[in-house]
Design a protein with these regions (language model features):
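Glycine-rich, aromatic-flanked loop segments that form ligand/cofactor-binding clefts
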Residues: 59-88, 106-133, 153-177
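Divalent metal-dependent hydrolysis catalytic cores, especially in the metallo-beta-lactamase
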Residues: 37-43, 123-129, 283-287
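N-terminal small/glycine-rich loop or linker at the start of catalytic domains
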Residues: 1-12, 73-95, 132-142, 172-192, ...
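Preference for extracellular/luminal or secreted protein segments
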Residues: 1-36, 239, 248, 267-378
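Second-shell residues forming the walls of enzyme active-site clefts
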Residues: 16, 22, 43-61, 66, ...
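Glycine-rich anion/phosphate-binding loops
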Residues: 46-53, 97-115, 147-156, 198-201
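Divalent metal-coordination and catalytic microenvironments
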Residues: 4, 38, 71, 117, ...
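Catalytic domains of carbohydrate-active enzymes, especially glycoside hydrolases
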Residues: 28-41, 112-114, 119-124
Length: 378
């Protein structure tokens, strides 16, 4: 197996780590795999200096220009909550923007999240959520969605992306082609969304159609859409959704990112080996394996084994790695940052808390308005 092929296979992986410091075992497999990205979770993040040191060491063992990713959407998905401050959810910010007639609140949300993730040494956040707040997914998605219509979602996301870009942080829109109709959680199973392609194209997919040029990365979900050409196959393994719809029909040119391949939404459908190969073959640029070193290594070895078996896959792997490396380089070059002083961190925390107060006050105003509004009976 040639060294360029090993480097190519590893560079298509975005991997997670066990704790706040690298272990000897992690250093060994990072040197072997040389992944294209590192993603950190709450278990990895204690405070800014420690997090920056962890990212510096891990990316030093990874592929050149490796992504440094974290999930900070606000609300329930905020890996920096304990280390910095809580942030309001997309739902709360979007609702406040509509209530107060201040769409720029979405931009401030993105700006603050951008400042926060930069302060900890990241160059990308896996946000915003572009899913619609439909009744089917209310229990699963909760406050992560900005609105129930494409117009509401696009209005918030457009502002959020501008704020994030002002801090030179790469966004990742998710979860294409839409989880608004998902009654189940893709962490646990493969939800079956019974919406037709026409319904999805004219509703769930509209924010992607409108905003794809502003999204450096888009994440594909693990739900199935049996009423479309993809049948029972999860979207993350479907060339129909990744290549035909997102790449060709919408014309997306950024990085296409899988949701975590350790999720039940795909691992209950296929093995980690099959998932790694199938998602890359379907058109994925980067695949996430976020927790288990064993599964990371199995996914990596599966890509190499398939490349050795198939000349066509070997060419695909090398081409995909070359293209993804170019895009990663462009993103990482935009996001170099210096550590904040303790005084600057305190000022950022205070600014976030003031923003929280603004959103909470708007929520109270909306509640009062709803309480005093006349009730129509139909």
């Amino acid at each position: 197996m040639t060294q360029p092929l090993r480097r190519a296979a590893g560079s298509l992986l975005v991997v997670g780590l066990a704790g706040p410091e690298l272990t000897g075992l992690e250093r060994a497999w990072l040197r072997l795999v040389r992944p294209g990205g590192i993603i950190l979770f709450k278990r990895n993040i204690a405070e800014p200096t420690q997090t920056r040191a962890l990212l510096t060491e891990a990316t030093g063992l990874a592929a050149p220009h490796a992504l440094r990713c974290v999930d900070v959407e606000g609300g329930t998905v905020n890996r920096l909550r304990d280390a910095l401050a809580p942030l309001p959810s997309a739902q709360a910010v979007a609702a406040a923007a509509r209530t107060l007639g201040r769409p720029a609140l979405g931009r401030e949300h993105g700006d603050l999240i951008g400042r926060a993730v930069r302060a900890f040494g990241f160059n990308s956040t896996l946000a915003p959520v572009l899913d619609l707040a439909l009744p089917e997914a209310a229990e699963v998605m909760g406050s992560r969605t900005a609105g129930s219509t494409p117009q509401e979602v696009s209005a918030y996301v457009r502002e959020f992306l501008a704020g994030l870009a002002s801090q030179k942080i790469a966004a990742c829109g998710k979860h294409f082609p839409g989880l608004g109709g998902a009654a189940g959680d893709t962490h646990l199973l493969t939800p079956s969304i019974a919406r037709s392609y026409e319904q999805l194209w004219s509703s769930d997919i509209v924010p992607y159609r409108e905003l794809h040029r502003a999204l450096p990365m888009i994440m594909i979900n693990h739900a199935a859409y049996p009423a479309t050409f993809s049948g029972a196959t999860p979207a993350s393994a479907s060339p129909f959704w990744i290549t035909k719809v997102l790449r060709q029909r919408i014309g997306y040119r950024g990085l296409i990112f899988s949701d975590d391949l350790e999720m039940g939404g795909i691992l209950k459908f296929m093995s980690i080996e099959e998932a790694a190969v199938t998602t890359i073959r379907a058109g994925m640029d980067l695949i996430e394996i976020c927790h288990s070193p064993e599964l990371i290594l199995r996914g990596y070895e599966a890509l190499l084994a398939e490349a050795e078996r198939s000349a066509a896959f070997r060419k695909l792997l090398l081409d995909r790695a070359r293209t993804a490396a170019h895009k990663r380089k462009r993103l990482s070059a935009q996001s170099e940052s210096r550590p904040l002083t303790q005084k600057q961190m305190s000022a950022l925390r205070e600014r976030i808390l003031r923003f929280n107060d603004t959103i909470a006050a708007a929520s109270g105003a909306q509640t009062a308005k709803n309480t005093t509004s006349p009730v129509e009976v139909s």
